[in-house]
């Protein structure tokens, strides 16, 4: 079984090749982008997408979350319009289940879904959407207790995500686990724990 996402015309296989995900369609720290969202300036947003495709991105992240806008409606509009000007697969990036469903409903292909985690409430919101519309879901190795400090703890959360997904008919090939990387300033062992988590994901899950 291979882990594959697609647009209407192009597939991206997650194997040994590094996959470049363009992250410019995201309001975090971008005042012009935030204003474009407030103004419903799709032309500005689409230009960000085209530029990233031209510069070698394999996948485009789409995050239009801003408290003062209608995120579900904006997600639907941006996903629709982006597909008309680029042929890269998209990663739908939102913490809103409603916005996620609006994007999935109009997406032509099999997207990357960002994200779920080990929290029961989050899995109960997102996995039914993945089962209904299809997609490869990013699973963050954290849960109600936060980010585990050890690789073993993160693997336990990863296993919980995989097992819960299976109950919805979602196979492990449609889950990409994110082992999480803490900054060295906040945890001097952070990088070591992340590398050990990645090794265990490869060898045990």
Protein language model features and the residues they cover:
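Domain-level signal for soluble alpha/beta catalytic cores
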Residues: 1-178, 182-205
